[in-house]
Amino acid sequence: MSTDEHLDPIPDSFILQPPVFHPVIPYGTTIFGGLYAGKMVTLQGVVPLHARRFQVDFQCGCCLHPQPDVAFRFSPRFYTVKPHVICNTHQGGLWQKEIRWPGVALQRGDSFLILFLFENEEVKVSVNGQHFLHYRYRLPLSRVDTLDISGDILVKAVGFLNINPFVEGSREYPVGYPFLLYSPRLEVPCSRALPRGLWPGQVIVVRGLVLKEPKDFTLSLKDGTTHVPVTLRASFTDRTLAWVSSWGRKKLISAPFLFHPQRFFEVLLLCQEGGLKLALNGQGLGATSLDQKALEQLRELRISGNVHLYCVHC
């Protein structure tokens, strides 16, 4: 498909911002579509051994002078006798009353994966998979459109995601999976073993970037005899997304075609009784039927096509 070809307009919430790898600090970027309830931002990196402090600001605009309003500042401090985290809001040129959280859940020299989950009334923060703090908004979330990172921090990747629609309303905390750049394990075609098959509740996560001139993208689930009970196939020539059965029958998925050249994507497959539920870029797109015995006999996930992979989890 030509890069000049017209793309159908789709809602901002369907489009995911590509991850940023190894940004130079200080680093600032616009958040595509701004923040809204259900948006997640992940931050992977390392705390330098000499670190005194760093801050992650979710801002209303990006001007340098005057300083923009900051809806939420997350600032770990390592230089005191008792390391802690400061959270605060900056409005109209003034910082408001800060909230101090004892402990940091991080130490100098530690690698980390911090996940910011934005909900209707508050933001929740987890560090390395453990819930750490929550902070009620003092400014409207809809005003936030900029991320700024500064201080003593080495950042490996910044990710922008929508919450998993399969756990909406659940008390479970979202799981943050790291983004990897140029990992040999993610070369396409990519294969992952499923030694125990798939069971209800299991989620397959595939994240990547569509290449410049793509033809197709397929995600296949094979059993121990190399039989392929089901395949998810995106065709860029006719702009269709479909489930393909083992005998070649197609079941088109009627939804906006979200795979576009040089755009980031996230595929989620949830195993449930009687089949698989699909979500793309955080949007549920229905299910396909597969009996439990067939699900348990699956032994391999195989990904092929014109994509660059950043994360595969199953």
Swiss-Prot record:
An example of a Gene Ontology cellular component annotation for this protein is: mitochondrion
Q: Where in the cell is it found?
A: Nucleus
The protein's GO terms of the molecular function aspect are: lactose binding
| Gene Ontology biological process terms from the UniProt entry | intrinsic apoptotic signaling pathway
| Pfam families per the UniProt record, alphabetical | Gal-bind_lectin (PF00337)
Q: What is its main location?
A: nucleus
Q: What highest taxon heads this organism's lineage?
A: Eukaryota
Family annotation (PANTHER family)? GALECTIN (PTHR11346), GALECTIN-12 (PTHR11346:SF111)
The text the record gives for the protein's domains is: Contains two homologous but distinct carbohydrate-binding domains.
- Please explain the role this protein plays, according to its UniProt record: Binds lactose. May participate in the apoptosis of adipocytes.
Annotated protein name in UniProt:
Galectin-12
Instruction: List the source organism.
Output: Mus musculus (Mouse)
Q: According to the entry, what is the taxonomic lineage of the organism?
A: Eukaryota, Metazoa, Chordata, Craniata, Vertebrata
**Which gene name belongs to this protein?**
Lgals12
